[in-house]
Amino acid sequence: MAKAIRRSCAKHLFAQCGSGFNLEQGAYIGNGKKFSVGDNVGLGKNFTYHCRIVTIENDLMMGENVLFLGGGHKHEHEHEDLSIPMIQQGGLPDTPLHIGSDVWIGSRAIILSGCKSIGAHSIIGAGAVVTKDVPDYAIVGGNPAKVIRMRK
């Protein structure tokens, strides 16, 4: 019953919500207006999404405690102006994230704002910290995530 309630809420809150959608307990998605999912998408327990336009195509599997983070603080200059507190040096704009079809994201993976695309048929290893785009058919892992091998 709880899954049906979460699914019903998502269909009303998300920009788009396909059939076969599953949202596990403890997920945080904010207002959902920037969040679109295709068919057969499963978001894992305690999934957290902040500040991004997210489009997920069909057939996504996700483990527990996955984070999609966007925006953030400027890091390209490593907060080099020491006369200004880091918190006052401003943040970065949100960047869209597109996730292709047939993707598996392992537990505790973190997708940061530097990643704008996770390619179709790819696998993100458990605990990976994804800072850059992931090509189609790639298996990535580590911190920062790197291509381990290609599935095809």
Question: What residue spans do the PLM features occupy?
Answer:
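Secondary-structure boundary/capping signal
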Residues: C17-G18, A138, G142
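C-terminal/domain-terminus segments
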Residues: I111-I139
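Extended, small-residue-rich solenoid/repeat segments and analogous flexible loops
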Residues: M1-Y28
